[in-house]
């Protein structure tokens, strides 16, 4: 991907998640971008969820079926990261159904009473 790449919602990108603490995902790993390109471009940040290959049947996992990456998006581990300093690299795109499922699980988690 060219140096002019700007992440967009639905993209799968490789990011460096280190440093992290506790149960958070760390290391260089794929993530699903949730924020739109216009936000990512203006702020230099992106909102994303990490992807794991260790599928455990956890309620907030969203299985990804595309050829770009195998695993599950962790919809409850939302991050807002500097995508340039975390060395974002484009890997592929998830389906509209998959991004809708991530957003639905996130909405359930953030429901305010």
Question: How does the language model describe each region?
Answer:
Residues 1-113:
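Conserved functional hotspots at enzyme active or ligand-binding sites that engage polyanionic ligands
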């Amino acid at each position: 991907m060219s140096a002019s790449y700007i992440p967009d919602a639905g993209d799968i990108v490789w990011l460096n998640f280190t440093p992290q603490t506790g149960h958070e995902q760390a290391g260089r790993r794929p993530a699903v971008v949730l924020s739109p390109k216009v936000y990512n471009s203006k702020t230099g940040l992106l909102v994303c969820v990490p992807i794991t290959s260790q599928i455990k049947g956890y309620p907030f996992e969203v299985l990804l079926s595309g050829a770009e990456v195998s695993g599950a998006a962790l919809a409850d581990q939302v991050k807002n990261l500097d995508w340039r300093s975390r060395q974002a690299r484009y890997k592929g795109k998830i389906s509209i159904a998959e991004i809708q499922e991530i957003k639905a699980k996130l909405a359930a988690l953030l429901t305010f009473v």
